[in-house]
UniProtKB/Swiss-Prot annotation:
Domain of life: Bacteria
HAMAP family in the cross-refs: GreA_GreB
MF terms in GO: DNA binding; RNA polymerase binding
InterPro entries named among the record's database cross-references: GreA/GreB_C_sf, TF_GreA/GreB_CS, Tscrpt_elong_fac_GreA, Tscrpt_elong_fac_GreA/B, Tscrpt_elong_fac_GreA/B_C, Tscrpt_elong_fac_GreA/B_fam, Tscrpt_elong_fac_GreA/B_N, Tscrpt_elong_fac_GreA/B_N_sf
Coiled coil regions, renumbered to chain: 12-74
Source organism of the structure: Caldanaerobacter subterraneus subsp. tengcongensis (strain DSM 15242 / JCM 11007 / NBRC 100824 / MB4)
Entry similarity comment: Belongs to the GreA/GreB family.
Record-given protein name: Transcription elongation factor GreA
Transmembrane segments annotated in the record for this chain: none
Annotated function: Necessary for efficient RNA polymerase transcription elongation past template-encoded arresting sites. The arresting sites in DNA have the property of trapping a certain fraction of elongating RNA polymerases that pass through, resulting in locked ternary complexes. Cleavage of the nascent transcript by cleavage factors such as GreA or GreB allows the resumption of elongation from the new 3'terminus. GreA releases sequences of 2 to 3 nucleotides.
Length: 157
């Protein structure tokens, strides 16, 4: 059996929307590009055709990936998110003692991680270190830039 893909409800909706978009809009666009490229004649030296076929392969691969992820999805119910300790689906406010600043992270499954928006995977160094910890605890985490110290200030949904 495949490993479950842990998602928040929001993450599930985003993946479903992406899948729908790829199946309805992008498939049709690429099919049209292939049709137009075929009209140019000789396919052996037709870069437009090759490009469209590569795009089609990428889209079909992404569709297959999304379908597999959704098939194995385990959605975290907001009511199941514990607030007494850090768990997947919660938002954690920490004080970064190394850089002397407050930072908020939302702990999510790796499928919906988006570090640029402070959504970090439960498998990332910081996410892994925060899991199971409580407000008031301080942790040291080894990250690519070195070791950072984080004090947990707040846990919420």
């Amino acid at each position: 059996m495949s490993k479950p893909v842990i998602l928040t409800y929001e993450g599930l909706k985003k993946l479903e929307e992406e899948l729908e978009y790829l199946k309805t809009v992008k498939r049709a666009e690429v099919a049209e590009k292939i049709k137009q490229a075929r009209a140019f004649g000789d396919l052996s030296e037709n870069s437009e055709y090759d490009e469209a076929k590569n795009e089609q392969a990428f889209i079909e691969g992404r569709i297959a990936t999304l379908e597999a992820m959704l098939k194995n999805a385990k959605v975290i119910d907001e009511e199941d998110i514990k607030l007494d300790e850090v768990s997947i689906g919660c938002t954690v406010k920490v004080f970064d003692e190394t850089y002397n600043e407050e930072v908020e992270y939302t702990i999510v499954g790796s499928a919906e991680a988006d570090p640029m928006n402070n959504k970090i995977s439960d498998e990332s160094p910081i996410g892994k270190a925060l899991l199971g910890k409580k407000v008031g605890e301080t942790i040291s985490v080894e990250v690519p830039a070195g070791v950072i110290k984080l004090k947990i200030l707040e846990i919420r949904r």
